[in-house]
Swiss-Prot record:
Organism of provenance: Citrobacter koseri (strain ATCC BAA-895 / CDC 4225-83 / SGSC4696)
Keywords: Ribonucleoprotein, Ribosomal protein, RNA-binding, rRNA-binding
Gene: rplI
Keyword Transcription found: no
A GO molecular function held by the record: structural constituent of ribosome
The protein, known as: Large ribosomal subunit protein bL9
Cited function: Binds to the 23S rRNA.
């Protein structure tokens, strides 16, 4: 199925590209998320008329994402207190929601879906590097310090 991309999609293309994808991927993911429209003659003409407007909107979204990433990087460290045993093992774990809540409480709005934990949830006290994917092209880093209550 031919679609026109309205946003940058990983491993597929960027704004304005006409790509061929499986019908289910287009129907169930790309179109409902607003990342693509079917490449009909009417949609192609409509897209070409609005191309500059869409590119400007995409640039604004990218600039806003960069600004948020700078704010996250400026925080440097966020401290989270949790119950822990004598050897530094936590009772439970600290996941994406806990980290997102702590960063939001520190003054930067972050969704839990933007938090990336490559090694899984945090289960020990100490300092941990946490990545944030604010936009498909914009990443930020933050140190989370887990202390025992």
């Amino acid at each position: 199925m031919q679609v026109i991309l309205l946003d940058k999609v990983a491993n597929l293309g960027s704004l304005g590209d006409q790509v061929n994808v499986k019908a289910g991927y287009a129907r169930n993911f790309l179109v409902p998320q607003g990342k693509a429209v079917p490449a009909t003659k009417k949609n192609v003409e409509f897209f070409e008329a609005r191309r500059a407007e869409l590119e400007a909107k995409l640039a604004d979204v990218l600039a806003a994402a960069n600004a948020r990433a700078e704010k996250i990087n400026a925080l440097e460290t966020v401290t989270i207190a949790s119950k822990a045993g004598d050897e530094g093992k936590l009772f439970g774990s600290i996941g994406t929601r806990d980290i997102a809540d702590a960063v939001t409480a520190a003054g930067v709005e972050v969704a839990k879906s933007e938090v990336r934990l490559p090694n899984g949830v945090l289960r020990t006290t100490g300092e941990h590097e946490v990545n944030f994917q604010v936009h498909s092209e914009v990443f930020a880093k933050l140190t989370v310090n887990v202390v025992a209550e």
